[in-house]
């Protein structure tokens, strides 16, 4: 039977398995009668079947197909934050919570609003607070026109300089107005007749276009007719205006916008461009939109002129301030060519009075009448002036320096004072002092010039005194006198002069000079400058000679007296030691060099031997300087290793002195330890005592023949007893032994004798007030005074204040019953930063009766104790 001949109601009863149903197809189609194939019979859809299919598609019953359903469940706040599955498949109800919230005893809340384009990536913490913070920061970062509520043509005082808000920060969600024309954003004019309400958006920017201007009754009177744009001229406009910048007024005034050229945005929104300097610019004059600043108002755009006419004109400055150009100074600008003088960095030099003639330091230049020119201060600490005279950045500086207005200096006034200079009321005394200082400096430079050109002669007597008094203790120069003379002859003239002057100044002064020799007349400042300007020291022999000269100057500075510590009489010893040690390390002398005994026996004055001897002399001087002044060590223990070759190279007493100096360095470390309890530590005490005992056992063979070595060992023992704060009777025994040895005629003169005298005097003065030890202490002080007076009559002058003079002065005061340091003041060489801690430090003393004297000894050293 043909399918087409069947009745209509019997079509549904035919079972065609291969024919796809309408539900399985994604779109309806038309069947072609001629496109039939075997096994395929098209199905004709009926209206009932279509209605049943439509009802099944739109059904929301739970028995419907899963694929056709949409996801309606969402997670709660806790599950979203933890990124776990939430079993709340339906909308949240009060009193109902998911399993996770019930487990943690939390409220199941659904505060997050689902987004249109799908769920967010995780839980956004504090979304409301972040949104409020972002909106608040956007409002605060966009400077709107101050004083937006006004009436008529009167603007508020704060709105005279309107600021421009960036276009990106404006919320342009005005979808209600559909305008096809291009919009132009510009600052709101200040001459609007009606009051602008606060709820208008945007508040500080107005969107101008032709259709909006016609439909707005409030803004139509304020917008001129040229603001209407034609479609032909809209393409030449930039999409956004630029920020206001300097140097753009000229480009705006030179623009000639005719009617045929179409409307162009104001060029005062263009970015700044570099302009050539054509003259001074008023600092207080800001670029504004006032028409009075235009060079040719007739050539400018009338639209912009009408828009800018509503802006108030800025006030004219009463006292304009001219700033110098920031680029290259002009040739005619005398202020830019002024160079700083040497006295501008001197704290003792005052400023030049206003009625004095113009000098390099007066900063007075010729400027136009009625105007003041800002001086270009050459001091590094002077800040760079800003554009505004009353800028907030200048107010803290002016209040700090008590300068009324340092950036409005008239041509008839004196320059502002430097903040680092100390001024006094007596200007004449300061000027006289500065003149005397300049005269002394000029004399010093003249002497340096003479020394630089002078060929110093060889003095055999002075060289012999060096080998007798210095070289036997500290072998600095060559062992051979002839070898030294030949090396000096080959050296450059300035280096040779510096070395010979250093030798003569050391041996021709107390306590080494005799009555028949006068002091060396050349000042040490000149010798030091001559040594510092020495050139042509690239050769190894010249560098060794330069190092030896610095060591000699360090010893001479130590012998000069207490005035060198305070800086009143030349450079201190620490300065020369630091320079010499720096040069030695630059020469790589701290690296251990292995010298064979054969090479030492063949040549004791080779370059390698001289370098090793100079290194060990620096080690000795560094240890004794650190202990005597409580200064840190320059050379660490890691670069010190005394070998048999070094002992052979140095000699008997210098090698033993090096070993003893290492113990002095250990005691100095204990004295300067940050923890004062280290001095009473039994382990530290036992270690130091074992080092001294080991040294004594190694020199027992020659102990009775070397009086100077006995004195040095006793000196170290006194330092140890003071370090551990021993009882007064224990410290008095080695101190009395030192006084006895010093008064002996067999004790030679060495560069370390003033150390022995000073330490013994400090201990005897400290225990003098104890009744049970006063007689013995008095006897020791008399021995030291007799020795000093006898030697001072031979080698010293009455007006020369060396170490012997200071020791003798203290002994006489104590013997006459005068109180010493009963209420002492802070020594002059103690810095002000540590003076408070020094004066208030409390330290228990079992050695001295006065605990303050013991504190003074521990903080300043035995040489600083005498000052």
Curated annotation (Swiss-Prot):
GO terms for molecular function: DNA-binding transcription factor activity, RNA polymerase II-specific; RNA polymerase II cis-regulatory region sequence-specific DNA binding; zinc ion binding. One of its GO terms (cellular component) is nucleus. The keyword DNA-binding applies. Gene3D superfamilies: Zn(2)-C6 fungal-type DNA-binding domain. Keywords: DNA-binding, Metal-binding, Nucleus, Transcription, Transcription regulation, Zinc. Residues 76-108 bind DNA. Pfam families: Fungal_trans, Zn_clus. Residues 137-167, 248-257 have a biased composition (Polar residues). This is Uncharacterized transcriptional regulatory protein C320.03. It comes from Schizosaccharomyces pombe (strain 972 / ATCC 24843) (Fission yeast).
């Amino acid at each position: 039977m043909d399918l087409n001949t069947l009745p209509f109601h019997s079509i549904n009863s035919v079972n065609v398995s291969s024919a796809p149903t309408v539900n399985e197809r994604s779109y309806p189609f038309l069947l072609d009668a001629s496109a039939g194939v075997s096994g395929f019979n098209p199905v004709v859809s009926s209206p009932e079947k279509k209605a049943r299919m439509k009802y099944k598609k739109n059904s929301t019953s739970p028995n419907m197909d899963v694929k056709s359903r949409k996801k309606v469940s969402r997670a709660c706040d806790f599950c979203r934050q933890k990124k776990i599955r939430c079993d709340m498949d339906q909308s949240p109800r009060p009193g109902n919570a998911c399993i996770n919230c019930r487990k943690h005893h939390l409220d199941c809340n659904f505060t997050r609003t689902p987004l249109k384009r799908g769920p967010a990536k995780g839980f956004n913490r504090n979304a409301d607070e972040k949104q409020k913070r972002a909106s608040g920061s956007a409002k605060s970062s966009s400077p709107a026109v101050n004083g937006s509520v006004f009436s008529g043509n009167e603007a508020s005082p704060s709105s005279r300089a309107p600021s421009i808000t960036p276009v990106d920060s404006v919320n342009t969600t005005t979808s209600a107005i559909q305008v096809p024309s291009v919009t132009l954003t510009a600052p709101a004019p200040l001459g609007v007749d009606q009051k602008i309400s606060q709820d208008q958006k945007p508040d500080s920017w107005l969107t101008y276009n032709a259709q909006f201007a016609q439909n707005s009754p409030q803004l139509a009177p304020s917008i001129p007719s040229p603001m209407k744009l034609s479609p032909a001229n809209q393409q030449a406009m930039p999409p956004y205006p630029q920020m206001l910048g300097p140097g753009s007024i000229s480009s705006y005034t030179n623009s000639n916008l005719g009617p045929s050229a179409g409307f162009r945005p104001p060029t005062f929104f263009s970015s700044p461009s570099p302009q050539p300097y054509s003259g001074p610019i008023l600092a207080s004059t800001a670029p504004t939109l006032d028409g009075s600043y235009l060079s040719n108002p007739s050539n400018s755009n009338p639209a912009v002129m009408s828009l800018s006419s509503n802006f108030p004109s800025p006030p004219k400055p009463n006292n304009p301030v001219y700033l110098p150009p920031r680029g290259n100074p002009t040739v005619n600008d005398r202020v830019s060519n002024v160079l700083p003088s040497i006295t501008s960095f001197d704290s003792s030099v005052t400023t030049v009075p206003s009625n004095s003639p113009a000098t390099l330091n007066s900063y007075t230049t010729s400027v136009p009448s009625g105007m003041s020119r800002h001086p270009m201060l050459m001091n590094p600490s002077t800040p760079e002036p800003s554009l505004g005279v009353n800028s907030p950045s200048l107010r803290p500086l002016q209040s700090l320096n008590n300068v009324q207005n340092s950036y409005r200096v008239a041509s008839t006034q004196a320059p502002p004072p430097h903040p680092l200079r100390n001024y006094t009321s007596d200007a004449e005394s300061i000027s006289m002092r500065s003149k005397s200082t300049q005269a002394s400096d000029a004399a010093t430079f003249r002497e340096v010039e003479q020394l630089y050109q002078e060929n110093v002669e060889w003095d055999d007597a002075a060289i012999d005194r060096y080998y007798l008094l210095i070289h036997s203790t500290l072998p600095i120069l060559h062992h051979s006198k002839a070898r030294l003379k030949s090396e000096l002859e080959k050296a450059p003239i300035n280096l040779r002069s510096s070395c010979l002057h250093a030798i003569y100044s050391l041996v021709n002064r107390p306590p080494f000079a005799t009555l028949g020799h006068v002091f060396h007349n050349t000042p040490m400042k000149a010798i030091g400058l001559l040594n510092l300007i020495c050139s042509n020291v690239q050769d190894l022999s010249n560098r060794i000679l330069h190092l030896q000269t610095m060591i000699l100057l360090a010893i001479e500075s130590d012998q000069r007296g207490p005035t060198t510590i305070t800086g009143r009489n030349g450079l201190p010893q620490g300065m020369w030691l630091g320079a010499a040690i720096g040069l030695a390390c630059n020469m790589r002398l701290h690296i251990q060099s292995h010298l064979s005994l054969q090479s030492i026996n063949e040549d004791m004055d080779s370059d390698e031997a001289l370098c090793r001897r100079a290194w060990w002399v620096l080690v000795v001087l560094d240890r004794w300087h650190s202990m005597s002044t409580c200064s840190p060590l320059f050379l660490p223990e890691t670069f010190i290793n005394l070998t048999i070759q070094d002992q052979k190279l140095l000699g008997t007493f210098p090698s033993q002195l090096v070993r003893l100096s290492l113990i002095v360095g250990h005691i100095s470390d204990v004295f300067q330890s940050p923890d004062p309890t280290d001095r009473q530590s039994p382990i530290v005490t036992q270690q130091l005592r074992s080092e001294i005992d080991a040294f004594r056992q190694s020199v027992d063979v020659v102990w009775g023949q070397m009086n100077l070595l006995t004195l040095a060992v006793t000196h170290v023992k006194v330092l140890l007893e003071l370090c551990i704060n021993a009882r007064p009777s224990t410290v008095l025994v080695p101190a009395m032994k030192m006084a006895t040895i010093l008064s002996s005629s067999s004790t030679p003169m060495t560069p370390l004798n003033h150390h022995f005298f000073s330490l013994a005097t400090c201990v005897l003065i400290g225990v003098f007030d104890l009744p049970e030890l006063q007689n013995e202490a008095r006897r020791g002080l008399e021995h030291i005074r007799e020795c000093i007076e006898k030697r001072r009559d031979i080698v010293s002058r009455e007006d020369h204040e060396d170490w012997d003079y200071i020791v003798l002065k203290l002994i006489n005061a104590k013997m006459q019953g005068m109180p010493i340091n009963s209420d002492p003041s802070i020594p002059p060489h103690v810095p002000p930063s540590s003076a408070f801690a020094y004066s208030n430090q409390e330290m228990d003393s079992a050695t001295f009766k006065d605990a303050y004297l013991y504190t003074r000894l521990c903080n300043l050293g035995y040489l600083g104790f005498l000052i």
